[in-house]
């Protein structure tokens, strides 16, 4: 029979029942793993195509129209699918096609002769590259017959002939809206109807991503501005600092850069262990990557470190974005040292956006770490006003950062009138085990707000982070009973923040996680959560306070590092008849942002008589010389006051967070940025310290900068003086762009700045050589 079989085993009939009536069997030539496929004929025996206009002799059987060339139309598909910025699509050597599921992409197929729909049948065979045993049932193997325009079937996948000109076909292929996300291989089988077939294997794999523009996709998000922000924006802001001094820090997500998409898929499949057949499910994928981004269980992307000793790695505060972290991990396949919560969240957001998942980074201030699922955070205080770290298993972080991912939750039935689709909290910081792995989420944010803490996954933990009550107990010794000295129902879960859509400003999303404090709805949600968590705690500890003496902190909240600051406790006697003697212990400690006290800076113990109706104050003045040797990463302090009112059984304890502010790097462009043209810029920093800054270094990332620029200063920066560095970059694309800068030195670290600007399109050149 030669190289083209005259028989065709019709095992799979993709268009049976759709009116086509053409039984097609997906086959493949070359080194296929399917033994029943048909071999591709050697080039020497393929008949020459007829000349244009030739009419085959009625007595001569036409040859199979074999595929000669396939063009995946990178530029056209990149624009249509909003994937043109992926380095895979844009690189000079061996570019790859990246498309989104549920949306047609175009290919141009050149045949060995003109296509005749009366005698020719064409079928596309798509296979998930990582599938060990591709199968139709698991969706890792798909056969799609070519149909005429207007004859689209109701099948999940479709291939439609858009147009034809002689031997060139333009075909629109639509992957299913729930297609597996990952790398796919494409084969094209051609045959004569009722005769044998030959197969063509396209040389390169292509990528299918989630498609939040597709209404049938589980991650569909309506609103172009939202999609531009949460899928396509490669730069964002992550909030750090404290609830009373919010600090926005620029973060380069870099989801389109070299190796980022491949690394994201590696984290899903190899580290996260998601089977190919499950890679279309965003719930399964997000839960897996929340563990894969951290390292304790599976040697994932980032190793956490909260010790303040970062030997052998990069301090978390020195990262400017996700690109270098993920590229280093993908190259070495070892966890990158080191990260803390905002690094884990920034990397997770990058991975999600690279895969096509709408994602945003979210910060909660005064976030509870409730290890006992009690919905309270209990602190024990000794007679010196110190928090007893050895007795505290819970903690309150100055801030905590996680990621929200947008998706429907078909795995959850609606309950109590709530629909659980929308934003889902996903946390990759390794804090607590969930199903025996360090991961958290996806937890429906609406379930958190309603107190539905049993809704998967980890809603109870997220609820406690933003709703737990803070309780302080006075510890007087192992034989003495604990004494309740303060409770705080309002301090946890403040100023929940994310970057605003289309603006480099803060959007407060606290109301998406919780009802207003002390509202009827908020208390109802808390009581529901307490019942569902079977907590032993109740509200019986909410006793009446002693109200004759009112205590209040007065603290300036805009102190630049290098400057002195003062802490004042004001005590007002509200009684018109009774004098009171009060002993006040006031202390200032440096604290890690996780809430753990590091070093004592200064303390004062005084006794004051406060006459009826009078006001007294206790003050501590703290100089730079007092605190600079004790500073830790976030320049955060814990201010604590323990006051004992004599002749009563009342003790007052309060604490507050405070941080000194770092200066900002100023960035200035020299000229108007134009696509494809080299630009110059200047980054400037002023030294706010009373001492010189030595061996300073700038890190720069921006449009067209493939590798982070490191610029070392050759001279010290004297107190009050400025240092500037020049750098160049060439924007590859027009539109909005951002330059991000970091500065570090021994004396002054974790300083950043950014500049957001517009890049003009490349100017067209007319025939005279002038710009049109």
Swiss-Prot record:
Protein family per UniProt: Belongs to the transglutaminase superfamily. Transglutaminase family.
Enzyme class: transferase
Reactions catalysed: L-glutaminyl-[protein] + L-lysyl-[protein] = [protein]-L-lysyl-N(6)-5-L-glutamyl-[protein] + NH4(+)
Residues of the active site: 400, 427
InterPro entries in the cross-refs: Ig-like_fold, Ig_E-set, Papain-like_cys_pep_sf, Transglutaminase, Transglutaminase-like, Transglutaminase-like_sf, Transglutaminase_animal, Transglutaminase_AS
Function: Participates in morphogenetic activities of the cells, maybe by stabilizing the membrane or subcortical structures of cells that are under mechanical stress. Probably catalyzes the cross-linking of proteins and the conjugation of polyamines to proteins.
S-palmitoyl cysteine: lipidated positions: 4-5
Cofactor descriptive note: Binds 1 Ca(2+) ion per subunit.
Subcellular location: Cell membrane
UniProt keyword Calcium, yes or no: yes
Cofactors: Ca(2+)
Official protein name in the record: Annulin
UniProt keyword Repeat, yes or no: no
Region entry Disordered, spans: 15-57
Tissue: Has an annular, or ring-like expression pattern in epithelial annuli of developing limb segment boundary cells. In embryos, it is seen in gastrulating cells, in cells surrounding rapidly dividing neuroblasts, and in muscle pioneer cells invaginating to form apodemes.
Annotated Ca(2+) binding sites: 467, 469, 517, 522
Highest rank taxon of the organism: Eukaryota
Topology within the bilayer: Lipid-anchor
Biased composition regions of type Pro residues, renumbered to the chain: 38-53
Molecular function terms, GO-annotated: metal ion binding; protein-glutamine gamma-glutamyltransferase activity
Main location, first listed in the record: membrane
GO terms under cellular component: plasma membrane
């Amino acid at each position: 029979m030669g190289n083209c079989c005259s028989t065709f085993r019709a095992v799979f009939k993709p268009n049976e029942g759709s009116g086509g009536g053409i039984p097609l069997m997906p086959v493949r030539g070359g080194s296929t793993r399917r033994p029943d496929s048909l071999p591709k004929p050697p080039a020497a025996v393929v008949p020459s195509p007829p000349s244009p206009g030739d009419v085959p002799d009625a007595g001569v059987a036409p040859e199979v129209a074999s595929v000669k060339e396939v063009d995946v139309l990178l530029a056209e598909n990149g624009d249509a699918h909003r994937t043109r910025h992926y380095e895979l699509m844009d690189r000079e050597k061996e570019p790859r096609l990246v498309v989104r599921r549920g949306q047609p992409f175009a290919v141009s197929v050149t045949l060995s002769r003109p296509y005749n729909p009366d005698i020719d049948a064409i079928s596309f065979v798509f296979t998930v590259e990582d599938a060990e045993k591709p199968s139709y049932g698991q969706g890792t193997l798909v056969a799609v017959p070519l149909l005429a325009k207007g004859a689209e079937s109701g099948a999940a996948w479709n291939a439609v002939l858009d147009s034809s000109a002689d031997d060139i076909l333009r075909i629109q292929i639509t992957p299913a809206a729930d297609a597996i996300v990952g790398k796919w291989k494409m084969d094209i089988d051609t045959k004569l109807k009722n005769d044998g077939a030959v197969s063509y294997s396209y040389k390169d794999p292509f990528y299918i991503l989630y498609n939040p523009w597709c209404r049938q996709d589980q991650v569909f998000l309506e609103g172009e501005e939202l999609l531009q922000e949460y899928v396509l924006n490669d730069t964002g802001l992550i909030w750090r600092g404290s609830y009373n001094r919010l600090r926005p820090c620029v973060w380069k997500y870099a989801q389109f850069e070299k190796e980022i998409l491949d690394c994201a898929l590696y984290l899903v499949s190899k580290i996260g262990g998601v089977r190919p057949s499950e890679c279309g499910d965003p719930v399964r994928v997000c839960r897996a990557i929340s563990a894969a981004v951290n390292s304790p269980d599976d040697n994932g992307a980032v190793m956490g470190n909260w010790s303040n000793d970062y030997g052998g790695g990069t301090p978390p505060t020195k990262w400017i974005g996700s690109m270098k972290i993920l590229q280093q991990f993908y190259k070495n396949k070892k966890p990158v040292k080191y990260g803390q919560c905002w690094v884990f969240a920034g990397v997770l957001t990058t991975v999600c956006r690279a895969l096509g998942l709408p994602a945003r980074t979210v910060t909660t201030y005064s976030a509870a770490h409730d290890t006992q699922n009690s919905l309270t955070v209990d602190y024990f205080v000794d007679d010196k006003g110190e928090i007893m770290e050895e007795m505290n298993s819970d903690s309150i972080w100055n801030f905590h950062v996680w990621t929200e991912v947008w998706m429907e939750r078909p795995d959850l039935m609606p309950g109590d009138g709530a629909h659980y689709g929308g934003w889902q909290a996903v946390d990759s910081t390794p804090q607590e085990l969930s199903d025996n792995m360090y991961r958290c989420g996806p937890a429906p944010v609406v379930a958190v707000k309603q107190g539905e803490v049993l809704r998967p996954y980890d809603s109870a933990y997220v609820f406690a982070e933003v709703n737990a009550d803070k309780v302080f107990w006075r510890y007087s010794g192992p034989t003495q009973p604990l004494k309740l000295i303060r409770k705080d129902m309002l301090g946890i879960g403040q100023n929940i923040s994310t970057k605003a859509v289309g603006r480099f400003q803060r959007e407060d999303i606290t109301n998406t996680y919780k009802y207003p404090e002390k509202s009827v709805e908020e208390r109802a949600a808390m009581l529901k959560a307490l019942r569902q968590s079977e907590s032993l705690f109740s509200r019986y500890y909410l006793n009446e306070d002693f109200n004759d003496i009112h205590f209040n902190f007065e603290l300036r909240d805009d102190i630049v590092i290098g400057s002195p600051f003062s802490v004042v406790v004001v005590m007002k006697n509200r009684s018109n008849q009774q004098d009171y003697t009060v002993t006040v212990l006031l202390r200032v400690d440096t604290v890690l942002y996780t809430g753990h006290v590091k070093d004592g800076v200064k303390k004062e113990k005084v006794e004051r008589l406060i006459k009826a109706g009078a006001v007294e104050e206790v003050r501590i003045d703290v100089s730079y010389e007092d605190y600079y040797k004790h500073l830790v990463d976030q320049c955060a302090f814990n201010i604590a006051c323990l006051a004992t009112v004599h002749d009563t059984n009342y003790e007052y304890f309060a604490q507050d967070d405070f941080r000194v502010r770092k200066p900002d790097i100023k960035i200035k462009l020299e000229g108007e940025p134009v696509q494809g043209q080299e630009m110059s810029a200047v980054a400037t920093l002023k030294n706010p310290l009373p001492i010189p800054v030595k061996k300073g270094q700038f890190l720069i990332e921006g449009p067209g900068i493939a590798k982070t620029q490191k610029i070392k200063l050759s001279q010290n920066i004297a107190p009050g003086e400025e240092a500037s560095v020049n750098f160049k970059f060439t924007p590859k694309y027009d539109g909005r762009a951002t330059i991000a800068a970091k500065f570090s030195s021994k004396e002054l670290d974790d300083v950043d700045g950014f500049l957001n600007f517009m890049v003009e399109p490349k100017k067209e050149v007319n025939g005279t050589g002038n710009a049109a």
